[in-house]
From Swiss-Prot:
It is found in: Cytoplasm. Pfam families: Fe-ADH_2 (PF13685). The lineage of its organism: Archaea, Thermoproteota, Thermoprotei, Thermoproteales, Thermoproteaceae. Zn(2+) binds at residues 160, 241, 260. The gene is egsA. GO terms for molecular function: glycerol-1-phosphate dehydrogenase (NAD+) activity; glycerol-1-phosphate dehydrogenase (NADP+) activity; metal ion binding. PANTHER family: GLYCEROL DEHYDROGENASE (PTHR43616), GLYCEROL DEHYDROGENASE 1 (PTHR43616:SF5). Homodimer. Its main location: cytoplasm. Pathway: Membrane lipid metabolism; glycerophospholipid metabolism. Its EC number is 1.1.1.261. It comes from Pyrobaculum neutrophilum (strain DSM 2338 / JCM 9278 / NBRC 100436 / V24Sta) (Thermoproteus neutrophilus). InterPro entries: G1P_dehydrogenase_arc (IPR023002), G1PDH (IPR032837), Glycerol_DH (IPR016205). This is Glycerol-1-phosphate dehydrogenase [NAD(P)+]. Binds 1 zinc ion per subunit.
């Protein structure tokens, strides 16, 4: 008999044009007085100010994500406004102080908009607080705002979704070989998000219509729910993410660094090849939306890519993937050659 299971998923999801205007309705159902709004450094600050003005009846303070003092308390509600970094910092603060969290994504570049988990890079920096898990009580995705985000960020969101087929296959492999707990329902949710973008890559790639962004946001939210059900990032993060993390760790802070979703898409192509999955289909979908489909296009050096492929398995030793105990340099190079990434 299986043990008792529990999971947390967002109780409210509002998306569409003008969704940001619904924030007061969501907050009115909570017993809060002081609100911390965490934003990015650029255009997202203006959206954070909009949220603050909508909550004029509350005491709201706006901080950029790199200004947040995790030891400072006194807030009743945390609202993250922006892309990956402000939303991740909002999750960390919510987790540390056990306060409810609302996320307001201003772009859709990865599945962190609905996930209870944070990026690998940030998780390493804040691991003294434990494993950060903070499921938002509400997601407010205003598609009119997201539609105005840089196209590169939106394409990166597609790239993140292209990796889900590999993540699920890695999970299944770990289940069979290592006895890891597996949720078919969570896996199917993740795969559904992958299938949505592959089937519609040619139509949504330019992101000129609200419905294009809506399809992307729905798929990303579906992945966040899948992770909540699984109780881990397993259904959405496998060897393709380990490859991306290995490169991100080396290039952190570098000028012109590749975006997370772009690296995930490249990783998905290589890992699909190793799994025997139809990697050409993934590469075709990536090309259809304008994602880099070669290392050169992504600005990644061959030596760095080989290093990432041969060391990625060490980043999370507890997460078994197709990489096993690691690829040899020659096997890594052959995979890159066979998939025409070089």
């Amino acid at each position: 008999m299986k043990q008792l299971e529990s999971f947390e998923i967002p109780r409210t999801v509002v998306f569409g044009p003008g969704a940001i205007l619904k924030i007061p309705d969501i907050v009115s159902g909570l017993r809060v007085g002081k609100v911390l709004i965490i934003s990015g450094k650029s255009a997202t600050q203006q959206y954070a100010k909009t949220v603050a003005s909508l909550l004029s009846g509350y005491s709201a303070e706006i901080l950029k994500y790199d200004e947040v003092e995790l030891e400072k308390s006194g807030f009743d509600l945390i609202i993250g406004v922006g892309g990956g970094r402000p939303l991740d910092m909002a999750k960390v603060y919510s987790y540390v102080h056990k306060r409810p969290l609302i996320v307001v994504p201003t772009s859709a570049s990865h599945d962190g908009i609905a996930s209870p988990y944070i990026s690998y890079i940030l998780a390493e920096k804040v691991k003294r607080y434990g494993k950060v898990v903070a499921s938002p009580i509400a997601i407010v995705a205003d598609t009119s705002i997201i539609l105005s985000a840089p196209r590169r960020l939106l394409r990166a969101g597609v790239g993140d979704l292209l990796g889900k087929v590999v993540a699920v296959r890695d999970w299944q492999l770990a289940h069979r070989l290592k006895g890891e707990e597996y949720s078919e329902y969570a896996a199917l949710l993740s795969l559904s998000s992958y299938r949505i973008v592959v089937a519609n890559a040619g139509k949504i790639g330019n992101f000129v219509r609200e419905e294009d962004v809506r399809a992307l946001v729905k798929a990303l939210i579906g992945c966040g729910v899948a992770m909540g059900i699984a109780g881990s990032s397993r259904p959405c993060s496998g060897s393709e993410h380990l490859f991306a993390h290995a490169i991100e760790r080396r290039l952190e802070g570098a000028e012109g660094e590749a975006i997370h979703g772009e690296l995930v898409a490249l990783g998905a192509i290589v890992m699909a090849y190793l799994h025997g999955i139809n990697w050409r289909r993934i590469k075709k979908a990536a090309g259809a939306v304008g994602l880099p489909t070669t290392l050169k296009q992504a600005g990644i050096d061959l030596d760095l890519a080989i290093e990432a492929l041969t060391t990625a398995h060490t980043l999370r030793p507890d997460r078994y993937t197709i990489l096993g105990d690691g690829l040899s340099a020659s096997a890594a190079r052959k995979a890159l050659e066979d998939t025409e990434l070089i």
